[in-house]
Amino acid sequence: MIGITANADEFVYKSFTTADIATMLGALCAFLLFNSRFFHLKQAAVFLGDAGSTAIGFCIVYLLIDFSQGSSALISPVTAGWILGLPLLDGSAVIGKRLLSGVSPIKPGRDHIHHILLDAGFSVNQTVGTLVLIHSLLVFIGVSAKLVAGFYADMFLFWLFVSLVFLRIIMTNLISRYSIASAKR
């Protein structure tokens, strides 16, 4: 009887988590609808802000940690990192670059990838489209490699992600040097 109760408790917990995910996805879809510029809107109608971004990030990370831990883990921790994809890659690269430069990692700056694209002349829609494409590619690589290679993919995927962070730092340095050299001409 205790085993049935424990299984029912876990089922209710997972169902509650599923309801939470569905609610969060619905809210995010509504936000994206009001924030898109596809309906001839010149600017976003809703501003998410720091608190909203932090809350969404916390919920996503909480769910990924929950799904990647324990005996009934649905995904591996490395796959969770690839699902986070672009925000994790960009944040790691920016923090790494700032630390290597001797700058505080929490100092504001225009070295995030969306700033780089906007400064390079991309429109807001082009920037969003590019970021969605890059993130989708990262998620596809992480999830498909895990499905194909199974357990042995974790170490490869981890080092591939670390390599991408360093590649992002190098590319950002090259772009900024090229931009500075072009501006001096």
What are these regions (language model features)?
Residues 1-184:
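Alpha-helical transmembrane segments
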